[in-house]
Amino acid sequence: MLAVHFGAGNIGRGFIGQLLQKAGYEIAFVDVNAALVDELNERKMYRVQLATTGKPESVVEGVRAINGQDVAAVAEAIATADLVTTAVGPNILPHIAGAIAAGITQRLTVHARPLNVIACENMIGGSEKLKEHVYEHLTESVQAQAAQWIGFPNAAVDRIVPLQQHADKLLVMVEPFFEWVVDSSQIVGEVPAIEGVTYVEDLAPYIERKLFTVNTGHAVIAYLGYQLGMKTIDEAMRDDRIVQATRGALQETGALLAAKYGFDPQVHGQYVEKILGRYTNPLLSDDIVRVARSPIRKLSQHDRLVGPALQCMEKGMNASYLGLAIAAALAFDYPEDAESARIQASLKEFGWENTLHNCTGIPAGHPLEEIVREQARRLKEWSGSH
C-alpha cells in the first residue's frame, strides 16, 4: 500500500507519517524543501522521539520523498496511491492542489478506483477546502469521474510538535497524546484501516471540541503571556493568573460544547485537564510568538476566540475570559508578524472600536464588545504590574 503525504515537516513525519507506517503503508513524502527530500531519499527512514520521561524512540522505515516542484513525479505517485494525506498548513493547500489534480486526472485516465484525500490541517473543513482548490484544476469530465471515485473526508487532528533542533535533521520529537478523527460519511470505497484513527459519522463536535479547547487554550496562554513579557508556553503556565484565565476560558467553551453537542461535562472536564497538562510539559515548550502569530486569522469570527465567545453570548453564557483573550490578541504588538503589524497600524489610524469590528466581525454595539472593552482595561492593569 502506498500513501502520498504532502508536507515532510515535523507534523508530517512525527504524526501522520508514523501512524501510516504503523498501518503498513509505504510513504512517499512530497515537500519543496530539497535538502529534506534528499535526506529522506538517502536514508529511507527517520526516528520519532516521545516528549516524556526517558524520551522513548521509534523508527519509521519504508519512506521516500518527491520534490513538490516535480509535478509529473507527484502525479505519477498519486495515480497509483492508496491514500493521500496533507499536513502543509491551511495557506499552502491552494499551492498543492494543481499537483493533486494532475495525479487524479492521470489516475482516472488509467484505471478508475477509489482514493481518499485527507487534509490533516489545523482548520475546519480542510479536505473540503482542498477539494474546491483541486476541482479548479480538473476538466468537467474528470470532475464528474472524481465525484464518483475520489473522496475528500474532513478530519480533525491534534498533536503538539514543539519547535526543536537536533543534530539529526530527520529526528522529530512529539508529545505522547494525539487525536486523528476522520469523517467516515465522506469516505469513498473502503475505510482505511489505520490504528489510532477514530472514524465518526459527524465530525463537527470533534472539530469544535479541539478548536475550542486545544487551540483556544493555546491562544489564551500565548496572548496573555506575551503581555506579561513571557517567552514560552510552559513559562506562562507558571503564572497563576494565566492558569486561572486559561482554565476559565476553557470552562466557558466547555459549557458551550456541552450545550451544543451533549458532551458529558465530567468527561469533557477530564479532557480539559489533560490539555492543560500538555501546556505545562517543558519538553513541549513552544515559543509564545509562534503560537500567537497570525492574530487576524485567529481573531476571525468563526475561529478559536471570537467564535466561541459569540456563541456563548447567544446562549446567555459567560464569555469574560474569552473576552480577555480577545483583548490580549488585539494588543499583540510584534512587528515581525505581518498581521500583528496590520492590527497595530489599524489601532493607530482607526481606533480600538473600528479595529475590533473589522478584525473580529463582532457587530457594533454587540454585548461582547463591552466585555472585550472591560477586559482590555483589566489587561492594562495586568501588564502594568509585571
From Swiss-Prot:
GO biological process, one term: mannitol catabolic process
Pfam families: Mannitol_dh (PF01232), Mannitol_dh_C (PF08125)
Catalysis: reaction(s): D-mannitol 1-phosphate + NAD(+) = beta-D-fructose 6-phosphate + NADH + H(+)
A single cellular component GO annotation: cytosol
Keywords: NAD, Oxidoreductase
InterPro entries found in the cross-reference section: 6-PGluconate_DH-like_C_sf, 6PGD_dom2, Mannitol_1_phos_5_DH, Mannitol_DH, Mannitol_DH_C, Mannitol_DH_CS, Mannitol_DH_N, NAD(P)-bd_dom_sf
Residues that, per the record, bind NAD(+): 3-14
PROSITE patterns in alphabetical order: MANNITOL_DHGENASE
Domain of life: Bacteria
GO molecular function: mannitol-1-phosphate 5-dehydrogenase activity
Oxidoreductase in keyword set: yes
Bilayer-crossing regions: none
Enzyme class: oxidoreductase
EC assignment: 1.1.1.17
Membership in a protein family: Belongs to the mannitol dehydrogenase family.
NCBIfam families found in the cross-reference section: PRK02318.1-2, PRK02318.1-3, PRK02318.2-1, PRK02318.2-5
Name of the molecule in the record: Mannitol-1-phosphate 5-dehydrogenase
